[in-house]
Amino acid sequence: MEHKGNEPNIIHGTLHYPGRSGGNPNTGTTTIANATSEFHVYKVIWSPTKISFYVDDQTTPYHSVDNSNALPFNHNFFLIMNCAMGGTFGGSIDPNFTQATMEVDYIRVYR
């Protein structure tokens, strides 16, 4: 799950792997009107056949990637919690910007 500073209400479900990283990730998006002012539940379901991204009570994923022998989805992954700004993904930073906060209530992993 990624947020861009210049599009704060658009949620990106993104997978980075060989050939799909940097400026060419495998990503899907959804929009939440209050993404920066309310807590939300972000969910990733990683099954043997696919990885799917959900937010809040969605019953249909906003992004899903099927597994194949060419993809590294049968190996361990890292969960990255990141508050990044600027660059090619985040866009230019307002010169009047002084600070921001990323609040995480909890992280739960099931196996």
What residues fall within each predicted segment?
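GH16 jelly-roll
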Residues: 1-111
